[in-house]
Amino acid sequence: MDILSEILTNAGWKADLLARTSLYKPWGFRFPCERSGGFHILSQGSCYGRIKGKLIHLEKGDILFVAKGLDHELVYSPNDKVVDIAKFRDMSEKQKRSEKLPLTTFVSVRYEVPDAIQHPFFLELPDYILVKSSDVLAHHPLNTTQVLISQELDSGIGSDLILQRLTDILLYYVIRHWLEIHPSSSPGWRNAFKDEKILSALEALHRKISYPWTLEKLSRAVGVSRASIANRFREVLGCTPMDYLAKLRMDKGKTLMAMENFTLEEIARTVGYSSAFAFSKAYKRIYGLSPRNSEQERLGA
């Protein structure tokens, strides 16, 4: 069980290819991100990202991930004028081919982030994550996934489903790379991934989400005392094991509801509740809305 992949899957982020283009200087794009985040992959040349006024130099093979809600820019040089990314097709079509001007090729992917309460792990992500190609081994999955994305796009018949899966894989490795090279001394999820007992407990809860867990059963599964596992959860994650389980079940239930293939009764049993009523009561306690009202809000009804 991979806890990070489970968290990302349950988050319900949906990828959308914004741009895949090659441009000659000068150029610049603005990326509005009120309800989205995303990343940029630089396949050729160099450019700059600008986030909250800070310039970030990007070179071939670099990946820049930007968190939800951060409007930002991508420019060839710091003084280039910018246009909204929605107009990138107009700009690319107007450019004339040149053998002299530097050429930059990049892929931009947007992730639409649901308005629902997200997993607390996402609150610990920085404004942006920069993955420098020079910091990644040649055969690292980050590089392999970039190649597969480029090949899928170059084929001209790229499947939306395949691109969605590949971008999800890339997002996973970008975040895992950040976790590996930026350890934290403060309490939080970044430490949970490195605490063997916490990780074992999380894996048990995720693997058997419908099991009638108690603190006693969880402590036996992990091989520590009830007091020890309870204290570790509070110190590292800021909640009790049972509070975490309740939120985990609701997140899973929310994901199943969005699929529209299950009745509320089926969802309740899948995530460990005896009835749709019990599930609905717990759901409203955590989200402040009943499952039905939550779905109506999601669909804009």
Model-assigned labels for residue ranges:
Residues 107-116, 124-189, 193-203, 228:
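An amphipathic alpha-helical interaction segment
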Residues 68, 78, 113, 152-156, ...:
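A general structural signal marking secondary-structure boundaries and capping sites
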Residues 1-65, 70-97:
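Generic protein-terminus/edge-of-domain signal
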Residues 38, 59, 158-166, 188, ...:
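Amphipathic alpha-helical recognition patches that constitute DNA-binding helices
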Residues 48, 55, 212, 261-262:
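Residue at a beta-strand N-cap/secondary-structure junction
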Residues 43, 145-153, 202, 206-209, ...:
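Regular secondary-structure segments
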